[in-house]
């Protein structure tokens, strides 16, 4: 469910309430959601989750992802150090939290050396901005 496109904020909060009440504690999103090609909506799902999460942060394991272009500049996408550092701060702000439990590279970035990506993610763990780093949509 990409909140902010398929359903409005009120319905999104109701879905999240229902899930939490049913025992669902893992919330997974991405900085690009809702991914519908409307630049003004980029990050809106994180905004909605952040507003919902007030007073509930300790009750959820929060995961989000980065990689897709979120702006017009060439560094606003991919798994480069610059994009990772900018993206995590943007996600933390939208999610209204001090840390992300699981921060994932959304897709492989064949242009950026993996050491650069892993080094930036390791720095975020050391800074306390993320607890764990992961990847999504990578081939086996």
Whereabouts are the PLM-identified features?
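Active-site-proximal beta-strand elements of phosphoester/diester hydrolases
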Residues: 1, 64, 102
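N-terminal binding-site loop/beta-alpha segment at the start of enzyme catalytic domains
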Residues: 1-60, 98, 126
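Tryptophan-centered motif/residue detector
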Residues: 3, 52, 67, 107-108
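Active-site alpha/beta core segments
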Residues: 53, 65, 75
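A short, structured active-site edge motif that brings together acidic residues
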Residues: 59-70
